[in-house]
Amino acid sequence: MGYLFQETLSSNPKTPIVVDDDNELGLMAVRLANAAAFPMVLKAALELGVFDTLYAAASRTDSFLSPYEIASKLPTTPRNPEAPVLLDRMLRLLASYSMVKCGKALSGKGERVYRAEPICRFFLKDNIQDIGSLASQVIVNFDSVFLNTWAQLKDVVLEGGDAFGRAHGGMKLFDYMGTDERFSKLFNQTGFTIAVVKKALEVYEGFKGVKVLVDVGGGVGNTLGVVTSKYPNIKGINFDLTCALAQAPSYPGVEHVAGDMFVDVPTGDAMILKRILHDWTDEDCVKILKNCWKSLPENGKVVVIELVTPDEAENGDINANIAFDMDMLMFTQCSGGKERSRAEFEALAAASGFTHCKFVCQAYHCWIIEFCK
C-alpha cells in the first residue's frame, strides 16, 4: 500500500540541550563505546534480505514500507510474531546512519515506514553480477572465523605472533580456507571487485592492445570476465589455487589455470594483481612480483589494483578511514599483510626488477598502478 508520510522529528524538540565542547566530546565517546551495534545490525539486515526487499519497492510509488510489510516480503518469512517490532528497532538504527530513510505514515496509527537510500545498491545480493556486492564482505568480516581472530589483537601487540594463527591452530588464512568449505565459499564472494574494475575501465585504457592477460590470484575469474567483455580480443588466463577455481564459473575467452604464484606464473603480455599484494609481507610480495616479471615480455606490465594509504592520518578523511580500517583487517587476518603507501609500492616495484611504477587512476577506494618491465 502507499503511504502519506512526514519526516520523523525529535520526540520532544523543545527540551533544552546543553551544547558545549565537553558535551559534544561526551556524545562522541558514547557513540564509540556502543559502536558494535551498527555493524551487527547491518549484518543481520543483510542476512535477512532487508535491503533487497526495500530496494525492490523503491522504484514504485509506494516505495515506503512498514515493518509489517517488510517482514512479509523477506526471502524467509519470520515465524516470530514480534519480527515487525524487532525490524522497526533495527531500521531506526540503520536510518540514523543514512542506510534507509525513515518517515511516519499520516494515516492509521502513524507507524514508522522505511525506504531504501541510494547507498543500499552497493549491498544488494542481486547486484553481484552488475557491480559486485559488499554484503558478503560485511558478513565475512563479522563471521566467527574473523571475530575469533580479532580477539587476539591485544595479545599479539603484547607478545607477538600471528593473530589468525593464534585463533586457528597455527594455520594461515588461505590454508584455513582449504579446510572450511563454508567459509571459503563465503570469502570468495566478498568484495567490490566488479564495481572497482568497471569504474576503472571508464577511464583506464591500459588493456588496449593486450593479447594475453593473466589475472594472478584471480579467484573465481570475475575480473577477467569484466575486462574481456570490453576487450573481447584478449585471451584471459585466470590463475589461482585449485580450491579457488573449484567455484569459478566459465567466462567467454577466459581459461582457468590452477597453480601457485609463489612457484611460477603463466606467460602473458600483461598481468593483473588485484588486491593480492595487501595479503602478504614485503618479502612474499617480491617473490610474487619476480615470478610475474619472469613471465612478462620486454615492455610488459603488471596492473596492480590496490588501496594506497595516505601519508598522514587526517581527521574526517573517508579515504584515510577506509585505508586504515583495511590495514588493521590485513594485520589481523592475513599473517603479515598490510596496506601500503605510494613509496612502499615504488619500493616493491624496484626490488622486483621493474623499471618504474605509475599511479594511473583511482576507482572508488582502489588505485590502478602499473609496474612496467
UniProtKB/Swiss-Prot annotation:
Induction: By the green peach aphid Myzus persicae. Transmembrane segments: none annotated. Pathway: Secondary metabolite biosynthesis. InterPro entries: COMT-like, O_MeTrfase_dom, Plant_O-MeTrfase_dimerisation, SAM-dependent_MTases_sf, WH-like_DNA-bd_sf, WH_DNA-bd_sf. S-adenosyl-L-homocysteine binds at residues 217, 240, 260-261, 274. The active site is at 278 (proton acceptor). The keyword S-adenosyl-L-methionine applies. Keywords: Methyltransferase, S-adenosyl-L-methionine, Transferase. It is an enzyme of class 2 (transferase). The keyword Heme does not apply. Its EC number is 2.1.1.-. GO terms for molecular function: methyltransferase activity; O-methyltransferase activity; protein dimerization activity. It holds the Pfam family Dimerisation. Involved in indole glucosinolate biosynthesis. Catalyzes methoxylation reactions of the glucosinolate indole ring. Converts the hydroxy intermediates 4-hydroxy-indol-3-yl-methylglucosinolate (4OH-I3M) and 1-hydroxy-indol-3-yl-methylglucosinolate (1OH-I3M) to 4-methoxy-indol-3-yl-methylglucosinolate (4MO-I3M) and 1-methoxy-indol-3-yl-methylglucosinolate (1MO-I3M), respectively. Interacts with B'GAMMA. Belongs to the class I-like SAM-binding methyltransferase superfamily. Cation-independent O-methyltransferase family. This is Indole glucosinolate O-methyltransferase 1. It comes from Arabidopsis thaliana. The gene is IGMT1.
